[in-house]
UniProtKB/Swiss-Prot annotation:
Family: Belongs to the heat shock protein 90 family.
Domain note: The SRT pseudosubstrate motif associates with STT3A during translation in normal conditions, preventing glycosylation of facultative sites until HSP90B1 folding is completed.
Modified residues (N6-acetyllysine): K76
Source organism of this protein record: Mesocricetus auratus (Golden hamster)
E.C. designation(s): 3.6.4.-
Protein encoded by which gene: HSP90B1
Name under which the protein is recorded: Endoplasmin
Length: 400
């Protein structure tokens, strides 16, 4: 398939349109004409392809194209160009290192600032809160999933704007951008989300951490020993009881889903992958009633099977809330059933009632009925034969 639509003229004489890399792949939708007075006419097309001046032309073509795209009016750009070629621009950020800064200014994303309109990174930076030094983003399979994630709860409550990444290529694109306008990007589903706090707020946080230390240690060393890296008091949760947070170099839930889908298509096993095998941080909300009750129960009896079950159920629901997949859904369903039994005061050991055995059908009456029908049928046949015999005898007498 043809990937370049650039025609080359030398001194207004058509030379060729058979190029393979005059424009990068992400700009394969651009059509144009190049006329040069500096290229030689008396050389073969193969030699011309390797001419050093073509490298300069290629570089200028890309920059001219990006400048031209930048001049498109915002309304027309957002409504028309971005819908058609937005993915191309994102791929350009990933592939074209030399023009990454120019391409970043052309990016558009959904954000918490507006329910329908898309925003540029320039507009996001203009709206940033005072002392905010990072651009916050949340990735998900849809806007609804991203904005309902536990990771954005406190950010939205405090009035921070969050960019929503809803396409598979989005997270790759942002990872390729080290920063924008001096502001680094922060995935809110990973470690590193911090807020400015006063001395009093800091003291309260430290007191809370000390209060919940028995529960945090119990989770890390006993209940969730093989499942998490550590358990900490969360600064990002306001409504949810807990969340599962990836390290800075680990995969978010969205990225893990994408990688697993790609591995499934290629037949690769990612279970041994360094990023996939990294344990995550379990963050708890100290103000949530479930967490407070767990702290009380652990202090009373840390070997209570019900509390152990509850800790694992919380971990598994946090896994789902945080966008990850559960490796063992049956075990999760069994634990939920045990919790339901306890809440309804049903004996955990109560078994399912056995189905009643099917009784054999009573065939005695049917057999007697069949015999009666056979007898009746036989009697009728005998009567018919007697009537026919009588008729024949009468006929013979009449003849005599």
């Amino acid at each position: 398939k043809k990937s370049d639509y650039i025609k080359l003229y030398v001194r207004r004489v058509f030379i060729t349109d058979d190029f393979h890399d005059m424009m990068p792949k992400y700009l394969n939708f651009v059509k144009g004409v190049v006329d040069s007075d500096d290229l030689p006419l008396n050389v073969s097309r193969e030699t011309l392809q390797q001419h050093k001046l073509l490298k300069v032309i290629r570089k200028k073509l890309v920059r001219k194209t990006l400048d031209m795209i930048k001049k498109i009016a915002d309304e027309k750009y957002n409504d028309t160009f971005w819908k058609e070629f937005g993915t191309n621009i994102k791929l350009g950020v990933i592939e074209d290192h030399s023009n990454r800064t120019r391409l970043a200014k052309l990016l558009r994303f959904q954000s918490s600032h507006h329910s329908t309109d898309i925003t540029s990174l320039d507009q996001y930076v203009e709206r940033m809160k005072e002392k905010q030094d990072k651009i916050y983003f949340m990735a998900g399979s849809s806007r609804k999933e991203a904005e309902s994630s536990p990771f954005v709860e406190r950010l939205l409550k405090k009035g921070y704007e969050v960019i929503y990444l809803t396409e598979p290529v989005d997270e790759y694109c942002i990872q390729a951008l080290p920063e924008f306008d001096g502001k680094r990007f922060q995935n809110v589903a990973k470690e590193g989300v911090k807020f400015d706090e006063s001395e009093k707020t800091k003291e309260n946080r430290e007191a809370t951490e000390k209060e919940f230390e028995p529960l945090l240690n119990w989770m890390k060393d006993k209940a969730l020993k093989d499942k998490i890296e550590k358990a900490v008091v969360s600064q990002r949760l306001t409504e949810s009881p807990c969340a599962l947070v990836a390290s800075q170099y680990g995969w978010s839930g969205n990225m893990e889903r994408i990688m697993k889908a790609q591995a499934y298509q290629t037949g690769k096993d990612i279970s041994t992958n360094y990023y996939a095998s990294q344990k995550k941080t379990f963050e708890i909300n100290p103000r949530h009633p479930l967490i407070r009750d767990m702290l009380r129960r652990v202090k009373e009896d840390e070997d209570d099977k019900t509390v152990l079950d509850l800790a694992v159920v919380l971990f598994e629901t946090a896994t789902l809330r945080s966008g990850y997949l559960l490796p063992d859904t049956k075990a999760y369903a069994d634990r939920i059933e045990r919790m339901l039994r306890l809440s309804l005061n049903i004996d955990p050991e109560a078994q399912v009632e056995e189905e009643p055995e099917e009784e054999p059908e009573d065939t005695t009456e049917d057999t007697e009925q069949d015999e009666e029908e056979e007898v009746d049928a036989g009697t009728e046949e005998e009567e018919e034969e007697e009537q026919e015999t009588a008729k024949e005898s009468t006929a013979e007498k009449d003849e005599l």
